[in-house]
């Protein structure tokens, strides 16, 4: 009877229920085509010197950084993201034991520190190595990169928003109060405070020193508590301290905001964005990051993270960062309409690359309403020799002036204005001149066109490329490959919210997901005989 031994702490005391069988090697228990073998072999080919540099010392008889890297990549492949769940798998799953090579399972804190303190430092370097290895294997083309972006929620707490508009408004009110307060102090205590356009923190500190000097000279003793009357000087100093703290707070928040319009108090790198996952259908903003994927031959070859909600300003930093890390350069850039801008067109051209970017008006330009809209420049007759447009009524719109406008990224665009000298009595006036909010009466208004010649030229060239047979195939592959990578991450891998706070940690998590997905994709291609395939062909009707 072993019943009395079941309640003992040592469960091996009733091991007669289990017969130990030889061999004990895990190598025999794991199938030859299991992806865990591919993970191990792939990581062994990588140079992890940058990862090892992040460690001061590595203890013996513990899992090495290379082994932990294998663990977290394989965990991502199997939708395991929590450090505690990874540790549990290391104790129960023979595939994880195979990667540990007989070493004890690392603690959950060790795994969390590995991701946040060590892997995050060299995450881009390791992703670049994986992309270079795939290129050497002939698995990626190195010619065409498909780019797309999505938003993933950060690990910030709810309702921790800080809005730039509210900060600037409150700061302006504070400056008004400070001007009155400084003038009042000058009148009460006979002092002089010198400042230029606006009162700064340094100005308030100098004023505080002057008031403290008066306190010492007059021997004023500050009092506290109920029933004790404060002097005017004490009230002024306490009010000054409150103003000083508020001004410091607003200055710090504006510095944290940078060129953003919002951030979260508990994750200052995250920006509030409108997400597609809106359960309440009220357009609620959530702290998130804009993740950019560069996909080639179904593999994620590069990743970048941006605080900007829109994709337009993310393309140039993405391409520069990718070129600095990868050992090869892409010649074709394929992206959707969210990336179209004059600045992006020019950068891609100057960088020796070809743009296949879907114009923002591509879909609407195919509609009947768009083609019959006489107010649009595209539906007017253009004379290049005179640089003028002829409207529906046969009147000529000539160049009147040029204006320069600066975008949020600092790019300067030149806009040319075309104006009709007289639209009086035109029967098409109400159809041609838009905008009902103008204060000028309709009968006194004339037709004006604002045209960016550079943008129009680059868009026309790009439209010709994307409507060709090759361009159509690239657009189809962008939909399949780039958008498919986010479908894999969000749906198949069930990753919709970051576990670690901070931009660097969020990027590290995204790169771990990408590396895990790439190994899964390589395993799938090997087993189905699709290795070396780059593009999906167009379907013929």
Question: For each predicted feature, which ranges?
Answer:
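A ubiquitous short alpha-helical element
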Residues: 7-10, 55-59, 470-473
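Basic, short loop/linker segments at the boundary and entry of helix-turn-helix/winged-helix-like folds
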Residues: 31-73
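Anion-binding and metal-coordination hotspots
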Residues: 2, 12-13, 72, 79-92, ...
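Hydrophobic alpha-helical membrane-insertion signals
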Residues: 1-37
């Amino acid at each position: 009877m072993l019943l009395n031994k079941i309640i003992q702490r040592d469960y091996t005391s009733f091991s007669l229920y289990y017969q130990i069988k030889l061999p004990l090697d895990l190598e025999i228990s794991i199938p030859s085509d299991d992806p865990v073998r591919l993970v191990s072999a792939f990581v062994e080919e990588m140079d992890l010197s940058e990862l090892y540099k992040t460690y001061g010392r590595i203890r013996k008889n513990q899992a090495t950084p290379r082994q932990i890297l294998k663990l977290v990549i394989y965990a991502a492949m199997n939708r395991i993201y929590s450090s505690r769940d990874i540790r549990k798998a290391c104790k129960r799953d023979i595939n994880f034991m195979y990667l540990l090579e007989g070493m004890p399972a690392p603690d959950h804190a060790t795994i969390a520190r590995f991701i946040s303190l060590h892997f995050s430092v060299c995450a881009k370097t390791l992703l670049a190595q994986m992309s270079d290895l795939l290129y050497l294997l002939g698995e990626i083309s190195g010619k065409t990169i498909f780019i797309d972006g999505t938003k993933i929620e950060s690990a910030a707490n709810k309702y921790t928003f800080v809005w730039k508009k509210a900060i600037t408004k409150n700061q302006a009110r504070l400056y008004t109060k400070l001007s009155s307060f400084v003038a009042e102090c000058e009148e009460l205590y006979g002092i002089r405070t010198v400042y230029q356009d606006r009162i700064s923190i340094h100005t308030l500190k100098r004023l505080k020193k002057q008031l403290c000097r008066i306190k010492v000279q007059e021997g004023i003793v500050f009092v506290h508590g109920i029933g004790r009357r404060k002097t005017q000087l004490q009230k002024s100093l306490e009010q000054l301290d409150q103003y000083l703290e508020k001004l410091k707070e607003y200055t710090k928040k504006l510095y944290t905001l940078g060129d953003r319009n919002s951030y979260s108090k508990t994750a200052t790198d995250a920006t509030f964005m409108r997400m597609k996952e809106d359960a309440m259908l009220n357009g609620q903003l959530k702290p998130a990051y804009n993740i950019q994927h560069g996909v080639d031959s179904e593999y994620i070859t590069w990743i970048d993270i941006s605080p900007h909600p829109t994709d337009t300003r993310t393309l140039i930093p993405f391409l520069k960062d990718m070129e600095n890390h990868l050992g090869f350069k892409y010649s074709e850039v394929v992206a959707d309409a969210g990336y179209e801008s004059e600045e992006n067109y020019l950068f891609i051209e100057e960088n020796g690359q070809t743009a296949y970017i879907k114009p923002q008006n591509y879909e609407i330009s195919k509609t009947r309403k768009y083609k019959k809209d006489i107010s649009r420049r595209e539906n007017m007759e253009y004379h290049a020799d005179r640089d003028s447009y002829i409207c529906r009524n046969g009147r000529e719109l000539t160049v009147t002036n040029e204006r320069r406008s600066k975008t949020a990224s600092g790019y300067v665009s030149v806009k040319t204005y075309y104006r009709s000298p007289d639209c009086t009595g035109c029967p098409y006036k109400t159809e041609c001149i838009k905008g009902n909010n103008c204060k000028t009466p309709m009968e006194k208004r004339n037709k004006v066109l604002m045209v960016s010649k550079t943008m129009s030229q680059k868009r026309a060239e790009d439209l010709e490329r994307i409507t060709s047979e090759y361009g159509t195939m690239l657009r189809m592959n962008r939909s399949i490959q780039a958008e498919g990578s986010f479908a894999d991450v969000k749906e198949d891998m069930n990753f919709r919210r970051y576990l670690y706070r901070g931009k660097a940690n969020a990027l590290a998590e995204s790169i771990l997901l990408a590396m895990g997905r790439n190994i899964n994709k390589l395993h799938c291609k090997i087993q189905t005989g699709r290795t070396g395939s780059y593009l999906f062909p167009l379907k013929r009707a």
